[in-house]
Amino acid sequence: QLLDKYLFAIDLEGGATFSAMLTNPFGCAIFTLLFLLICYLINKGEVSDGIEKFNKVGMPALFLMLVIVIIRAVTLPGAVEGLKFMFKPGYAVEAGFIEEAPSLLNVVATAGGQMFFSLSLAMGAMITYGSYLSKYENLKKNSVVIVVADTCMALMSGLAVIPAAVANGIANGVPYDQITLSGPKLLFVTLQDVFAAMGDIGPLFGIVFYLLVLIAAISSAISLIEVVVAFFVDRAALNQRPANRSRVVLWVCAAVTIESLLVAIDGLGASGVFTFWGTDNWNDNFLDFMDCWSEGIAMPLGAM
């Protein structure tokens, strides 16, 4: 009863659970704090003891779980329509997924935003991790490997999600233009329905997939926290006042926690706590506001 009241509605299924969570600021805040506690415990150690050890296990596990989910996703009835949506030019308009093709400028802007975010450009991550490399490392080779690996993982992620979402929509008689193919609802509503439709094996694939999402989220969070931590630690070293890494990580995580709690409490706008006026992309919820600020303004300016 306590879990039902304060964390989530345990008697609900699929998208209903997600909707219940969004309207429960306390539950969202608790899970946010637990996530950031994990990040703190990983970051507070030396890089080789914390982040490096996590990634040595987490990244191969992520790849393996992604392959498992892809195999199941592309073998679902109707998955071929999702593959056409991804890889056949013009098919999204032809089949009715969207009314008209986006403009070239829109495509370039969207691809550019994805590039900056996916490769952690203009946010200090590459500089920070690069500073930990040996001087004997081949930077040109590493750059090519990173870009190729990132592109492959992006395509694999699409193969794990889009065909399954389209197949689920077809199975439920949902018109193509009403199938959710992006955003949190795709991840936490549509895909839950997909796993539920798989029968007895569905929960297993669901567990594997959401563990995959968790590992990806943790690896991204600890890398960005490390950027800020490294800045303060290195600045203290330059001033010949060595900083206590654990203490720096604690203060950085405390600041991140405050901002993260604002997003969690807002519940993607479901709680009605925050309302923004301005452009259409800024007025839905606090997460969209921060996303527009970071990807639309801060990251491009930082890159320049």
Which sequence ranges carry the predicted segments?
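Hydrophobic core segments of alpha-helical transmembrane domains in multi-pass membrane transport
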Residues: 1, 30-44, 60-73, 162, ...
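Inter-helical loop and helix-membrane interface segments of multi-pass membrane transporters/permeases
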Residues: 1-48, 78-109, 184-188, 268-289
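Transmembrane alpha-helical segments of multi-pass small-molecule transport proteins
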Residues: 3-44, 120-127, 207-211, 221-225, ...
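Membrane-embedded translocation segments of transport machinery
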Residues: 52, 56-222, 236-248
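Re-entrant/interfacial helical elements at transmembrane boundaries that shape
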Residues: 160-165, 226-233, 269-278
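Hydrophobic alpha-helical segments of multi-pass membrane transport proteins
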Residues: 217-223, 248-267, 279-282, 288-304
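Alpha-helical transmembrane segments
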Residues: 227-243, 286, 304
